[in-house]
Amino acid sequence: MNTYEELKARGLIAQVTDEERISDLINKGEAVFYIGFDPTADSLHVGHFMALCLMKRLQMAGNKPIALIGGGTAMIGDPSGKTDMRKMMTKETINHNVECFKKQMSKFIDFSDGKALLVNNADWLLDLNYIDVLREVGPHFSVNRMLTAECYKQRMERGLSFLEFNYMIMQSYDFYRLYKDYGCNLQFGGDDQWSNMLGGTELIRRKLGEDASAMTITLLLNSEGKKMGKTVSGAVWLDAEKTSPFEFYQYWRNVDDADVVKCLKMLTFLPLEEIEKMEQWQGRELNKAKEILAYELTKLVHGEEEAEKAQIASRNLFAGGGVTGDIPTTTYAKADLDEGKDILTLLVDTKLAASRGEARRLVQQGGVSVNGEKVAAIDKTFTTAEFNEEAALLIKKGKKSYHQIKAD
């Protein structure tokens, strides 16, 4: 099975401009491809995971990745799939986020000796002269055609600013510059970027008379059709300070049964033959498949040592083995805990619940226990007197979410 066939078998490919040409480039290791990342936060998250894994997979096959950081386009905001205008960011915030991205991407991509490139589109977009843009790029775009693009449809009903309308032109110009300056012949992106990607291939054809290609990556959706990578406390981040290795492990350990094999195929580097055997697994074996998924992805992001620690901590909890230092922890001043904290406050502070209203419902539905005992009253207060032998309160939400409380 060649590289392109494996991408298809793993369910990674959605749309392509020219399958034969793209397949040929990838299989021969001649693809110089780019994926864009808007630095709208100081960490990458699970939503970026598919792209990072694809870049790693293709680099291993001899192709050259370009990670394009949207330092310039982040100052505009991408309307694709959005119903509201994104808040504009300062240059300082963007630059900080770019540095954070570099560090995280290096875990997936080898940037040594020119094997991959990290490029910031601020390098060319911020110096563009408006008249030059109108003269060089403007003639190659039809407003009528742009307005029919999928990426603008949602915003048209509620209002699309001229600022955001320019996003397609900017992204198309990115591809043009990467093709011209770095020999980039292929762009990857999500389905919601398809119109912008086609704009780039068209601009290259019109200005340079040459062919470039585009391919969209399958979105990472669960069995209910919702994007994966969200919890009650927000996004699942790749930064250990934002989402601990244990929380990251638990997220994948707790995926629905229907999603396990799909995630193994799309995100891990295990051989397909090994994964296909797991498709027949049921019951306890399926839980083993979830452990494999969680371990492999945690190892990829946080390293083998952290993956092993997270796996041990998870198994201890499920076996009733008590608290370990790898479980997410919130620490209060001892004086505050001596006075007591009510269960609703604890649930919100630990982000096991998004609000006091949600916390109240969890308790009333019998979904919360502390140190193995179910909490029945919404006004139940806990102090250091209730600490267990590990000097902690172990809060459990539902069957799979844990958090410990300690005193400083």
Where does each model-flagged region fall?
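NTP-dependent nucleotidyl-transfer catalytic core
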Residues: 1-193, 198-201, 208-213, 328
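Conserved nucleotide- and phosphate/pyrophosphate-binding catalytic cores
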Residues: 204-408
